[in-house]
Each structure stands twice: as C-alpha cells, then as structure tokens.
C-alpha cells in the first residue's frame, strides 16, 4: 500500500515565510480566510489525502481503466473516493463562492493540489483539467455559460477536459484540423481528437469538453485556432 505523509511543517513555512500569508489573506475577498481558518483546513486535507487517496495509488495503477461494452470503467480502487472529494469540497478550493466554491486564496488550492498530486498523480489530473475549464469560463464565458457550467464543475459533480491532440497534431497545434462550423447559436464540430486526459469516465455525472478547432475562413497555423 502506498504511504504518503503531507509535509505540513514545510507547508506552514512556505505560507508564513515565503508567501506572507498574514498579509495575503487581507486582500479583498479573502477576509474570511484567516490563518486560523487555514490552520483548520489544511490538516483535514492532509488527513483525507493520506488516509483515503494515497492507498489508491498502487491499487489503481495495478487495476487500470477498462473499456467494457463501449463504457469506460475506472479502477475499482477509485470507487467512492472521488465522491468523497466532492463531499469534502476538495476539488477546487479557490472556486468562487458565487458558484458553490469555498472562495479560498489560490495558494491554499495549490497546497491541496500538491497533496492530491503526491497521493495519486493519475487521479489528480481529473480536477486539474477541470480547473482549466473553470479558468477559461471565468475569463471568457458568457453569463449564460457561467451559470450553466461553473457550479457543477467547481464542486466536481461535472468534470472538464481540454481537447487538443489529433492523430497528426500532438505538441504541434498548428496542425490541428478539427473544424467548428457556426449553426445558429452553437457550432457543429467535425474532426478527431485522441489522448484526451479523463476524456470519458463514470466518476463525474457529466464531462464538459473544451475543443480546439478552426472556424471557416480561419488562417493556417496557431493563429487560426479557436476554443
């Protein structure tokens, strides 16, 4: 069984001596995230990732993910674990309170991410990809899109992905050929994407895909790619 111990003294040193958290939490919006509050949250996070998530690391790698009758089945070791992440609010600690998040500073979410990545790197990619979708929606999403997607993704009920890679386009995104054709208030997507991290699974109720594609008339190369 995998054994992982969170270096809590190192975390405290970083928060106090490098980040200067006592001043950091005085920033607008973080008034309720005092050092005392964080001192209560991080040990609970450590306990969860040490006791619940870390034991899945070896087991999940041994069991693997399977495609059964066209349905993706993740490792049995994950049964109930991701739901506990949702229930504990560990999927995205800095998610906006407006959309069901805890509204904590990003540095605290990073601490939680490090614990998850250290306890099970494969599972950590699930909320990591969701964070990318959350970030994109926060920056560029319409109010309708934010209201439709953010709460479920921030809480982890839904997960998100980024669809980049194609058979002929790996790290060279200028070779992306997938097309997005406008059709009323939406787009028709045509093309093939491969190697999409956590692209399909049963742990979340829904999987939201952000797709890199080209709209009609787009120039060649990276400048012609839309999200």
What do the PLM-derived regions correspond to, one by one?
Residues 92-97, 119-134, 156-166, 226-227:
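Core alpha/beta catalytic barrel or barrel-like domain that forms the active/cofactor pocket
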């Amino acid at each position: 069984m995998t054994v992982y111990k969170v270096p809590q003294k190192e975390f405290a040193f970083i928060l106090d001596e490098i980040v200067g958290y006592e001043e950091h939490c005085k920033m607008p919006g973080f008034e309720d995230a005092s050092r005392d509050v964080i001192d209560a949250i991080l040990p609970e996070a450590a306990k969860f990732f040490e006791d619940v998530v870390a034991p899945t690391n070896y087991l999940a790698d041994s069991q693997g993910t399977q495609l059964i009758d066209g349905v993706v089945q993740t490792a049995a070791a994950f049964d109930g674990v991701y739901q506990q992440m949702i229930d504990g609010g560990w999927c995205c600690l800095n998610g906006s309170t407006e959309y069901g998040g805890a509204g904590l500073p990003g540095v605290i979410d990073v601490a939680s991410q490090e614990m998850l990545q250290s306890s099970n790197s494969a599972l950590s990619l699930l909320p990591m990809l969701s964070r990318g979708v959350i970030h994109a929606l926060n920056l560029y999403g319409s109010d309708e899109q934010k209201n439709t997607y953010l709460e479920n993704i921030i809480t982890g009920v839904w997960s998100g992905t980024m669809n980049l890679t194609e058979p002929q386009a790996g790290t060279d995104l200028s070779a992306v050929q997938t097309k997005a054709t406008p059709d009323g208030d939406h787009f028709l997507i045509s093309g093939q994407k491969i190697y999409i991290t956590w692209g399909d699974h049963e742990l979340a109720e829904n999987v939201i895909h952000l797709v890199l594609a080209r709209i009609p008339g787009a120039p060649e190369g990276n400048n012609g790619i839309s999200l």
